[in-house]
């Protein structure tokens, strides 16, 4: 099976635990206003690789990855679901830690064939970094041109399967950096039993030059980048919302 790959980063340090071999998949149906990889949207082009090709390169440098592993990102890796499953299957057979960085956008429980593939994927995935773009359905649709009901359901599904979850959330002034949305996000993720980490990332405009090269208008032109202090502020609100959810769940359990 052939995978369409945009690029490979051999020394990734922000895409999962430890040093990572990071594979950027081609193709993404989301059109997030702050996307910094618009060159990955098109599912065509890039480099063609087999799972064996990628794992051979990983093996040639495996001493670097003793405390890390392989991360599939993009683009949206789930757009090449069959190839992703094959890659992770073969990686797990070699004892390699597998991490999926995804928006979960193609997940739907009501498709039995698709759900069976997701069940298989969960069996060979150690960690999922789920990027929740916006907790509010209407705002998510405006921000990413896709609904979020299936994405939030994917978070619940991952949790049901017992796979470790890291939540990622980008804060943008007047879009996601709004207290009641942050609290709502926290309340939602507070219900995830297998939540292991929360990354709150301040918006930056470093991807704007890629839009210019591709001849695409940058949706957030003029938007000011945020700071680490903004991220700390937002993270605190999210964690308070998560704590409240856990307290509410505990109270309900004690009343049963």
What are these regions (language model features)?
Residues 1-24, 29-47, 60-66:
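N-terminal [4Fe-4S]-dependent radical SAM core
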Residues 55, 59-69, 78-201, 206:
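Conserved AdoMet/S-adenosylmethionine-binding subsite of the radical SAM
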Residues 39-43, 141-147, 215-224:
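Short glycine-enriched, charge-decorated loop/helix-capping segments at active-site entrances
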């Amino acid at each position: 099976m052939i995978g369409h790959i945009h690029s490979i980063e051999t020394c990734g340090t922000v895409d999962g635990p430890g040093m990572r071999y990071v594979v950027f998949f081609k193709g993404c149906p989301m059109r997030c206003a702050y996307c910094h990889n618009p060159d990955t949207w098109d599912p065509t082009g890039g480099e063609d690789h087999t799972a064996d090709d990628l794992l051979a390169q990983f093996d040639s440098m495996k001493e670097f990855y003793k405390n890390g592993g392989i991360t599939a990102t993009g683009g949206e890796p789930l757009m090449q679901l069959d190839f992703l499953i094959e890659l992770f299957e073969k990686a797990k057979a070699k004892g390699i830690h597998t991490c999926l960085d995804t928006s979960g956008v193609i997940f739907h429980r009501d498709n039995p064939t698709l759900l069976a593939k997701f069940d298989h994927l969960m069996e060979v995935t150690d960690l999922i970094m789920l990027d929740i773009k916006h907790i509010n359905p209407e705002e998510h649709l405006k921000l990413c041109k896709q609904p979020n009901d299936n994405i939030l359901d994917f978070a619940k599904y991952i949790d049901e399967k017992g796979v470790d979850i890291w939540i990622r959330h980008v804060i943008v002034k007047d879009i996601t950096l709004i207290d009641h949305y942050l609290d709502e996000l926290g309340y939602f993720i507070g219900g995830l039993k297998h939540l292991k980490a929360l990354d709150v990332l301040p918006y930056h405009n470093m991807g704007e030059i890629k839009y210019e090269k591709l001849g695409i208008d940058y949706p957030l032109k003029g938007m000011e980048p945020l700071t680490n202090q903004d991220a700390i502020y937002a993270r605190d609100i999210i964690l308070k919302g998560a704590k409240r959810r856990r307290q509410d769940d505990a109270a309900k359990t004690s009343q049963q």
